[in-house]
């Protein structure tokens, strides 16, 4: 799932973040989308992704489509969180 994907990426680099997308929406420091940097969490209603720059995110979309790159604004952004 989406939060498991972001949890695993951060964990692989030695960072601890909460497990669910709801909890991840509160971790780290909030920043404006206009200041987003690669590695920031982009939080949506019931979904979370990682910003990779250039207005793009990488995320676990669905079981059928798997991990994919999408435009960050493909749905309304609720929060941007900087963990690192």
State where each predicted segment sits.
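Extracytoplasmic/secreted envelope proteins and their assembly/folding machinery
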Residues: 3-7, 36, 54
